[in-house]
């Protein structure tokens, strides 16, 4: 998605060679117009998949996932990273380690919001090592739901996430695929 790539080049900040800071438009300050366009793109790409729910992991995936869910006219389910007083029993849980923070957390899904009849579009802001997506897929498998596709805003293609997810048999559709980045440049994989 050229609009997202352009915004990454304009406002993204590379830290080292593997962290991309996008706090000016995705995960601290959110650009609602960009999120709407992202939601439209995901909705169009997955239009023929019979999606019944969009799922994301809190918190940076919420805005684009909500826009996609709205465009598809389906509910959004948010997988929780933090314990909650309202989510305390009848849960699916799995441990996930974040690439960015290098911390583990219990990813949680309430059993009453996903069923075996659901056809899921999983949306996340980044894909690096594929750990978050793999954890989300584990939870959705526990619920016997079908993962129809995975939508990623920014994929760091020089890391193994896409390969790991593809090896599990899932389609990954990324709006911006970065093949290389450092403090001075960001190179994208151009899709045909």
Swiss-Prot record:
The keyword Cytoplasm is assigned to this record: yes
Entry binding sites for xanthine: 20, 27, 156
Sequence positions that bind 5-phospho-alpha-D-ribose 1-diphosphate: 128-132
Subcellular location(s) of the protein: Cytoplasm
EC number: 2.4.2.22
Keywords, in A-Z order: Cytoplasm, Glycosyltransferase, Purine salvage, Transferase
Catalytic activity entry: XMP + diphosphate = xanthine + 5-phospho-alpha-D-ribose 1-diphosphate
Enzyme class: transferase
Gene Ontology annotations of biological process type: purine ribonucleoside salvage; xanthine metabolic process; XMP salvage
GO MF: xanthine phosphoribosyltransferase activity
Pfam family, any one: Pribosyltran
Pathway membership: Purine metabolism; XMP biosynthesis via salvage pathway; XMP from xanthine: step 1/1
Keyword Cytoplasm appears in the UniProt entry: yes
GO cellular component: cytoplasm
Coiled-coil annotated spans: none
Domain of life: Bacteria
Cross-referenced PANTHER family: HYPOXANTHINE/GUANINE PHOSPHORIBOSYLTRANSFERASE, XANTHINE PHOSPHORIBOSYLTRANSFERASE
Described function: Converts the preformed base xanthine, a product of nucleic acid breakdown, to xanthosine 5'-monophosphate (XMP), so it can be reused for RNA or DNA synthesis.
Protein name according to UniProt: Xanthine phosphoribosyltransferase
Organism: Agathobacter rectalis (strain ATCC 33656 / DSM 3377 / JCM 17463 / KCTC 5835 / VPI 0990)
Gene that specifies this protein: xpt
